[in-house]
Amino acid sequence: MAKMLKFGEDARRSMQVGVDKLADTVKVTLGPKGRNVVLDKKFGSPLITNDGVSIAREIELEDPYENMGAQLVKEVATKTNDVAGDGTTTATLLAQAIIREGLKNVTAGANPMLIRNGIRMAVDKAVEEIKKISKPVEGKEDIARVAAISAADEEIGKLIADAMEKVGNEGVITIEESKSMGTELDVVEGMQFDRGYVSPYMSTDTEKMEAVLDNPYILITDKKIGNIQEILPILEQIVQCGKKLLIIAEDIEGEAMATLVVNKLRGTFTCVAVKAPGFGDRRKEMLQDIAILTGGTVIAEELGRDLKEVTLDMLGQAESVKVSKDNTVVVNGKGNPENIKDRISQIKAQIEETSSEFDKEKLQERLAKLAGGVAVIKVGAATETELKERKLRIEDALAATKAAVEEGIVPGGGTAYINVINAVEKLTSDVQDTELGIKIIVKSLEEPLRQIASNAGVEGSVIIEKVKNSEVGTGYDALYGKYVNMIKSGIVDPTKVTRSALQNAASVSATFLTTEAAVAEIPQKEPAMPAPGMGMDGMY
């Protein structure tokens, strides 16, 4: 297919138009007085959002060169979202500023390769300084502040802080759509997996249709149980103890299931059977997790263990087990705390090593189930449009909170970038064009605060000068239009988000400046449809 070519200044300017179109759309959402953007959807109602990466993903431009520029900046937002989960608008804005300032210098004859070296030096110094002013997150209040700033909603901040307090920093917090109007928090303590009882006759509470077992024994196996003779020896031992039993197996069928149900209905003894969670290798790992949590042993053929030889000391134990139609929750497993700790360390190591997002998510879920539990934030709203917007805000706030716990917090509202300018300005280089790269970053670091001020309807330059001349940590509260100590006022950003936004913006922008030619496909014009009846002469 034939291609179009553009060179030098012409190519860079065309791509810059695309960068500006995308960044100008995204940056209106920045700060407490930022607005929303409406995204048209092929199916369903339009999406109203202030999430930078969601907006960037929707933008495709008609002109191929402009689109190239837009796609490069889209990568900045996407990468920042992947690493930190928030800060995508800031990253896009910084990329636009670095490209704009950089192109001015390249047009004036500066060498883009040397400018790139200066940009890298300045960014490394800025990141080093950001880490110096970072403070660790201390307690529930700090977590609530980070989430509230990210979502621009104090109620959401409190909700996320409650969730993290209940399940711990390692716990899993999921976000679901609620059937009601309100947003609420639902916490499941202990190990939960999505398998319910194999027969409704096993339920102990017929009104709620769930089985609750107090201090039960737990038999864990990866085998199918069809013949009651296989588990008869262990059942006899349990009946003598007067305890209840939970069986987790690949399947329970036929005679075995019938016998268990009949004994339950007669009141001889209570036993609930559930299918093992997961599939394939993941199932083996999950069964091992349950065994370690409850202090039991997995009865597996490959380990040479037979169901007929099972003794009481091979069974797991827990304070209570609750089984519904779809879920099983094991609360306070009586496993050895040291073994549980070792298992958690092992899963953490696997998370570090894996490159698959799906595997990482599943490992994180397993980690949470061992470490504390799962919290579900159920998001409610009056309309579907509001629900989607609210859900995106909560997702961003949750990501920001996790980032804050990981690397700490810095003064928010663009203040951290202003605070590091002094140190970056002191960098020097013998090469003039490298010096220009440093100056480009110095100028670009002002941009987030300038945009926050602009979105609040005030002149950014005045605000920037005032913050520069104030002590470190003092910034501009755009919501109330006054200068405050940002951390004391609860206006904070996660260090990881602030750092990632700058690093990703500089990475793509510095490479953008080195462009000398652009190659694009010639757009194909669709041939016009022939008029009806053409070429059909003489036909009736």
From Swiss-Prot:
InterPro entries: Chaperonin_Cpn60_CS, Cpn60/GroEL, Cpn60/GroEL/TCP-1, GroEL-like_apical_dom_sf, GROEL-like_equatorial_sf, TCP-1-like_intermed_sf. GO terms for biological process: protein refolding. The keyword Isomerase applies. GO terms for molecular function: ATP binding; ATP-dependent protein folding chaperone; isomerase activity; unfolded protein binding. It is an enzyme of class 5 (isomerase). It catalyses: ATP + H2O + a folded polypeptide = ADP + phosphate + an unfolded polypeptide. The keyword RNA-binding does not apply. Keywords: ATP-binding, Chaperone, Cytoplasm, Isomerase, Nucleotide-binding. Its main location: cytoplasm. ATP binds at residues 29-32, 86-90, 413, 477-479, 493. Its EC number is 5.6.1.7. It is found in: Cytoplasm. GO terms for cellular component: cytoplasm. It comes from the Bacteria. Together with its co-chaperonin GroES, plays an essential role in assisting protein folding. The GroEL-GroES system forms a nano-cage that allows encapsulation of the non-native substrate proteins and provides a physical environment optimized to promote and accelerate protein folding. Belongs to the chaperonin (HSP60) family. Forms a cylinder of 14 subunits composed of two heptameric rings stacked back-to-back. Interacts with the co-chaperonin GroES. PANTHER family: 60 KDA HEAT SHOCK PROTEIN, MITOCHONDRIAL (PTHR45633). This is Chaperonin GroEL. It comes from Clostridium botulinum (strain Alaska E43 / Type E3). The lineage of its organism: Bacteria, Bacillati, Bacillota, Clostridia, Eubacteriales.
